[in-house]
Amino acid sequence: MLSALGGNLSNARQSIAQVLNFALVLSTAFMLWKGVSIVSNSSSPIVVVLSGSMEPAFQRGDLLFLWNRGERAEVGEIVVYNVRGKDIPIVHRVVRSYTEEDKKLKAKKTKAGLPYVAPQKLLTKGDNNLADDTELYARGQEFLDRKEDIVGSVRGYIPGVGYVTIMLSEHPWLKTVLLGVMGLMVVFQRE
């Protein structure tokens, strides 16, 4: 009787160890993501190109690394932005930039002895598109605000690696299969 109880206790310990190991992997991945987000100053420091609008510079499925520490975006720079009200990252090139001075804010900051920098407005366009992005922006929006809309500027990429993400979003059943396989691996893994 005692040996049967000891065997069940050993199995319970193994199961708990497997669950804790899986939780450790997930929490490590989350901490790495948050760390990269803080260093890059971007809410989404790694994005996948979802369309062919930036060909030939970037292909669909390329994995992009973003940096959002610059105060200004230059014409010709490739940026990633989110349309207000939608959470879909768009990768396009800055084709026009201008600053819009807010006289009330400037007076307020000058009076307080703080430096005033006029907000930068940007117009973007995909390299493979005929027209600029004004049709993609939120209703009534003609330009992107550098501080509010830009997720980051592209600083590097790995070709094709992000295609797995595209496959998982286009074929939802693949997520189920992948999660099932991962779950079975955790359950049947023996150390």
UniProtKB/Swiss-Prot annotation:
GO terms for cellular component: signal peptidase complex. It is a single-pass type II membrane protein. It is found in: Endoplasmic reticulum membrane. Residues 177-188 are annotated as: C-terminal short (CTS) helix. The chain crosses the membrane at residues 19-39. Residues 1-18 are cytoplasmic. The keyword Zinc does not apply. Its EC number is 3.4.21.89. The active site is at residues 53, 92, 133. Glycans are attached at residue 41. GO terms for biological process: protein targeting to ER; signal peptide processing. Residues 40-191 are lumenal. It holds the Pfam family Peptidase_S24. Keywords: Endoplasmic reticulum, Glycoprotein, Hydrolase, Membrane, Protease, Signal-anchor, Transmembrane, Transmembrane helix. GO terms for molecular function: serine-type endopeptidase activity. It catalyses: Cleavage of hydrophobic, N-terminal signal or leader sequences from secreted and periplasmic proteins. Component of the signal peptidase complex (SPC) composed of a catalytic subunit SEC11 and three accessory subunits SPC1, SPC2 and SPC3. The complex induces a local thinning of the ER membrane which is used to measure the length of the signal peptide (SP) h-region of protein substrates. This ensures the selectivity of the complex towards h-regions shorter than 18-20 amino acids. SPC associates with the translocon complex. Belongs to the peptidase S26B family. NCBIfam families: sigpep_I_arch (TIGR02228). The C-terminal short (CTS) helix is essential for catalytic activity. It may be accommodated as a transmembrane helix in the thinned membrane environment of the complex, similarly to the signal peptide in the complex substrates. Catalytic component of the signal peptidase complex (SPC) which catalyzes the cleavage of N-terminal signal sequences from nascent proteins as they are translocated into the lumen of the endoplasmic reticulum. Specifically cleaves N-terminal signal peptides that contain a hydrophobic alpha-helix (h-region) shorter than 18-20 amino acids. This is Signal peptidase complex catalytic subunit sec11. It comes from Talaromyces stipitatus (strain ATCC 10500 / CBS 375.48 / QM 6759 / NRRL 1006).
